[in-house]
C-alpha cells in the first residue's frame, strides 16, 4: 500500500519498493545496534553484531569446501555454482541466507517494530535485574512481590501493544517472534502486567485484522518436535542445530555463564523464537518456521558481537593481544 502511494506520487515502482525495504532494514539494524550499545557500552560490539547479521555461522560452506577439495574441482565448481549451498533438508532453498529478507521485504519492517518493543521493555528488565538479592531469593521475588507485577508505565505498554498488533498486517512471524522475546524478558522483569497489556492488545488487533482480511482459519497450532531435523532424537536435533548455525546457538548457551544477570535475561528472550521453531507448527508447512530461527539469529548477534570484541581486546602483552585478535578473526 505504501509503495503504491509512492508510485502514485510519481516515484518509480521498483525504486519505491526498494526504498521502503532499505529503510526498514536500516532501521532494524540501527535499533539492533542500540540494544547492543545499551547492554555493553561498546561501539565495536554493536558494529560486529551488524556484520554477523549479514554473515552467519554455519557448516555448509566448509562441508562444500572439503568435498570439492577432495574431488579437485573446487575452483570450477565455485565459478559455475548457481544454487545455494546446503546439506540439510531444504537448505538449498536459501532458508538460512540473507535472501530471506529480500524475498520477504515485509519481514524487516516487522522486525523493526519488534526490536523497538524489545529496546523499550529493556527498562523493565533493568528494573527487575537491579535488585540486590541473589539466587533463588531473587527468582522468587520476580514472581511473588508487588513490584514484580504492578504496572510501571501503562501508556507505553498500550502504545507498544497497538504497534505490535498492527505489525501483524505486515508479517505475522515478526509479531510472534517479538512476543516470544518479550515473554522471555517478562520472566525476569518488574511490571509484568505491562507485558500482559502489551501482548493482549497485540493479539487482539492481530485477530481483528485476521477477521477483516482473511477468510477461514489463519493458524492451526500443533506440537511438532525437531523442525526439519532428520533425526528427531535430542542429540539429532542438537546436531542439526550445529549443522545450520555452527557454534552460534550452542556456543552462546555455554557463553551465557559469563554474562551478567540482565544480559542473560535478554539472551533467554532472544532464544525463545528458535526454541519455538523446534517445538510448534502453526501451519501445515513446517518450513515456514525458519523465520523464527532467523529472528533469534538476528538478535543473538548482539551477544556474539560483544564476545568477539572482548576476545579481540584480550591479553596484556604483545603475543597475547595478537593471539586474541587471531581467535576473534
What is the predicted function of each stretch?
Residues 33-91, 131-135, 146, 324-327:
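Transmembrane-helix signature of polytopic, membrane-embedded enzymes
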Residues 19-42, 116:
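Transmembrane-helix motifs of polytopic, lipid-linked glycan transferases
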Residues 22-25, 107, 176-179, 286-313:
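Hydrophobic/aromatic-rich transmembrane helices and adjacent perimembrane loops
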Residues 116-127, 180-187, 243-264, 307-310:
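Hydrophobic, aromatic-rich transmembrane alpha-helices
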Residues 9, 93-105, 208-244, 271, ...:
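Membrane-helix boundary/interfacial segments in multi-pass membrane proteins
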Residues 198-207, 310-329:
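Signature aromatic-anchored transmembrane alpha helix within multi-pass, membrane-resident enzymes
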Residues 127-155, 189-197, 252-271, 314-323:
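Membrane-interface helix-loop-helix junctions at transmembrane boundaries of multi-pass membrane enzymes
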Residues 98-103, 142-149, 156-171, 183:
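Membrane-interface alpha helices of multi-pass inner-membrane proteins
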Amino acid at each position: 500500500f505504501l509503495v503504491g502511494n509512492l508510485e502514485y506520487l510519481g516515484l518509480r515502482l521498483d525504486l519505491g519498493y526498494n526504498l521502503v525495504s532499505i529503510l526498514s532494514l536500516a532501521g532494524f539494524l540501527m535499533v539492533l545496534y542500540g540494544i547492543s550499545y545499551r547492554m555493553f557500552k561498546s561501539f565495536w560490539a554493536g558494529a560486529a553484531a551488524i556484520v554477523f547479521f549479514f554473515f552467519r555461522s554455519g557448516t555448509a560452506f566448509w562441508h562444500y569446501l572439503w568435498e570439492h577439495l577432495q574431488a579437485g574441482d573446487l575452483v570450477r565448481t565455485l565459478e559455475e555454482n548457481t544454487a545455494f549451498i546446503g546439506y540439510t533438508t531444504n537448505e538449498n532453498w536459501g532458508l538460512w541466507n540473507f535472501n530471506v529478507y529480500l524475498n520477504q521485504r515485509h519481514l524487516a519492517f516487522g522486525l523493526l517494530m519488534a526490536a523497538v518493543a524489545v529496546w523499550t521493555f529493556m527498562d523493565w528488565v533493568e528494573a527487575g535485574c537491579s535488585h540486590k538479592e541473589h539466587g533463588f531469593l531473587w527468582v522468587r521475588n520476580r514472581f511473588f512481590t508487588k513490584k514484580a507485577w504492578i504496572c510501571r508505565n501503562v501508556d507505553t505498554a498500550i502504545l507498544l501493544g497497538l504497534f505490535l498488533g498492527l505489525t501483524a498486517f505486515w508479517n505475522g512471524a515478526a509479531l510472534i517472534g517479538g512476543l516470544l522475546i518479550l515473554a522471555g524478558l517478562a520472566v525476569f522483569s518488574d511490571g509484568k502486567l505491562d507485558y500482559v497489556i502489551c501482548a493482549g492488545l497485540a493479539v487482539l488487533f492481530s485477530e481483528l485484522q485476521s477477521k477483516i482480511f482473511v477468510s477461514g482459519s489463519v493458524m492451526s497450532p500443533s506440537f511438532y518436535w525437531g523442525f526439519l531435523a532428520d533425526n528427531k532424537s535430542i542429540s539429532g536435533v542438537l546436531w542439526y542445530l550445529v549443522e545450520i548455525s555452527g557454534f552460534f546457538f550452542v556456543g552462546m548457551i555455554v557463553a551465557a555463564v559469563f554474562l551478567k544477570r540482565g544480559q542473560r535475561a535478554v539472551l533467554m528472550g532472544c532464544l525463545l523464537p528458535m526454541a519455538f521453531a523446534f517445538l510448534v507448527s502453526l501451519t501445515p508447512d513446517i518450513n515456514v518456521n525458519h523465520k523464527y530461527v532467523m529472528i533469534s539469529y538476528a538478535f543473538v548477534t548482539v551477544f556474539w558481537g560483544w564476545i568477539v570484541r572482548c576476545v579481540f581486546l584480550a591479553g596484556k602483552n604483545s603475543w597475547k593481544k595478537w593471539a586474541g585478535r587471531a581467535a576473534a578473526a
